[in-house]
A protein has these predicted regions:
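Conserved HGGG/HGGXW glycine-rich cap/lid loop of the alpha/beta-hydrolase fold
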Residues: 16-78
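Conserved alpha/beta-hydrolase catalytic His-Asp/Glu region
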Residues: 148-152, 164-230
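Catalytic histidine-centered segment of alpha/beta-hydrolase-like enzymes
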Residues: 273-286
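Conserved loop-alpha-helix segment in the C-terminal half of the alpha/beta-hydrolase fold
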Residues: 234, 238-273
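Gly/Ala-rich beta-loop-alpha elbow adjacent to hydrolase catalytic centers
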Residues: 109-113, 117
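Conserved acidic catalytic loop of the alpha/beta-hydrolase fold
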Residues: 88-105
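Flexible "cap/lid" loop of the alpha/beta hydrolase fold
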Residues: 119-122, 130-166
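The conserved beta1-alpha1 loop
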Residues: 42-44, 110, 245
Length: 295
């Protein structure tokens, strides 16, 4: 999904022998840039940093913006060994990039990227995470299994998905993927947008995606109790955080309602859209980002 302009640049960093690419766009006015919170985007499954940039143009005009390519995606390494695909390993890479960014970034993470962000939070703990970052926006992110039965079901789903990735051509898998109920609302998007999303998905490596599912799928998450305790701790520290879900995304809008009722984190339901709010409602998404940014 090549939408980079003349202000876009890429760079790389290494963690435990794995090379990660990231993209960044600088605000035109350096003085204003220093006054505004930078934003760090963490993409979802079968995406890359570029997948953020067709949306929410207002963010890119007002702030320095960074986007990481997670392992096995985009321009980052595609290791043979499974270890780098684990949530802790990807969380460590995210923390390494956070250290490279001037200023404390607002971390905006979608779906699988949210699992990575939560892993980073749990790795260093809420106190340290709050010192390293200025805020957290989680978009359509699972919070981990509540029970062993839920974990067992996730293990089966993820194993089935990894098997499908290995046994079918990628284009056939992506046809299956984009027809899941989770993405039904995206069928209302313009044909050009849907074609770009599909091309972005097809640019991936099937084996790398299978390893991501096996090593960083829902079944690999810490428990719901552990992740929500960390989020609640952030809130008690006055740390700005937001959970965002689409109204048409039955699973994650229900989760958002639960998080709100339990007083774990501030939530927002985007009307008339599904799982990918930043793609389907970029103006709403941009407003949410600015609402979490501290300055």
């Amino acid at each position: 999904m090549e939408v980079m302009n003349e202000q876009s640049e890429t760079a790389c960093f290494d963690v435990d022998g794995v090379r990660y690419r990231y993209l960044y766009m600088k605000e035109d006015d350096p003085a204003r840039s220093r006054r505004r919170t930078p934003v760090l985007f963490v993409h979802g499954f079968a995406q890359d940093a570029l997948s953020w940039f067709p949306t929410s143009r207002t963010i890119f005009l007002e702030r320095d913006v960074y986007g990481i390519d997670l392992v096995g995606h985009g321009g980052s390494s595609v290791p043979v060994h499974p270890a780098p695909y684990s949530l802790p390993a990807m969380g460590e890479a995210l923390l390494a990039l956070i250290e490279l960014i001037p200023g404390k970034p607002l971390v905006v993470a979608y779906s699988m990227g949210g699992r990575v962000a939560l892993s980073a939070l749990l790795e260093v703990g809420p106190a340290a995470f709050a010192k390293q970052t200025s805020g957290l926006l989680l978009e359509s992110v699972g919070m981990g299994p509540k029970t062993q039965a839920e974990r067992d079901a996730a293990i089966k789903r993820d194993a089935d998905m990894a098997r499908r990735l290995r046994e079918t051509p990628l284009k056939d898998f992506m046809t299956y993927w984009e027809n899941l109920p989770l993405f039904e609302s995206q069928k209302a998007l313009p044909k050009k947008v849907r074609a770009a999303v599909r091309a972005n998905r097809l640019a991936n490596d099937s084996e790398a995606l299978a390893k991501c599912v096996e090593c960083a799928g829902q079944h690999r998450m810490p428990s719901y109790r552990e992740t929500t305790a960390a989020l609640r701790d952030l809130g008690l520290r006055g740390y700005p955080a937001l959970y965002l879900a689409g109204e048409k995304d039955a699973k994650y809008s229900k989760l958002a309602a639960s998080l709100h009722e339990e007083g774990i984190v501030r939530t927002r339901i985007a009307p008339k859209v599904g799982h990918n709010v930043h793609l389907e409602a970029p103006e709403v998404f941009a407003a949410c980002v600015h609402s979490v940014a501290t300055r």
